[in-house]
Amino acid sequence: GTSSNANALGISAGTGIPPKKIGKIYGIIKAYTSRVGEGKFPTELFNNVGEKIREQGHEYGTVTGRPRRVGWIDLFNIKYTIMINGIDKIIVTLLDALEGINPIKMCTSYELDGKILESWPIHYEIIENCKPIYKSFEGWEAIPREQWTQIAQEGYGALPETMKTYVQTIKDELKTDYFALSIGPDRKETILMNSGEVW
C-alpha cells in the first residue's frame, strides 16, 4: 500500500530482489490525482467536479470509507517522480473515471511569484505558495460499462478522440512511452500499447 515505500527502491526492500536483477520500471499513475491525509495538493478540487471524480473513481478509504482528496492530474509532480525513480514506461489508470466531465484540466507546471518553475522545488514548503498552470481539454461523454469493455478489446484506436488527445498530451509532456492504459476495473479493460510485451 501507499503506507509502505512506494518508490522504485522500495521494490528491493519489500521483496528481497537485488536492484541489479530488476528489469524495466513501470510507473502507474491515475488520470487524475488523489491523496490520503494532510499535505500540499496544488491541483485539489473542492467543487462538484471533484465530488464527481471521487464518486466515479471510488475514491474512498478501503478500511475507513473516508473520502480521499482528489484533483486534476499533476504532470509537474509526475515528471519529478519519473526522474527520481528511473521509470521506463507508464501505465495510466482510471481514464473512465473522468467520463462526463467537461472541461478536463491537467497541470503542466507551477507558478511562483509570477515566474513559471522549470524544475521541482528544492524545499517542499514552497509548494504551498505555488499556483498550478493548467491546460484544458474537451472531455468525453459517459459510456456504459459494457461499451468500455468493448473499446478495450478493440484497442487504442477505439477510444474517444477527446480521450486520445488527453492521453497523447500526457505522453508528450512526460516524454515517456506508455505500457498500458486502463479504462475499467477489470483486467480485460486494459489496453496494452505494445502487444509484444508481457503483461
What do these predicted ranges mean?
Residues G1-W199:
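Non-transmembrane, aqueous-exposed alpha-helical and coiled segments at domain scale
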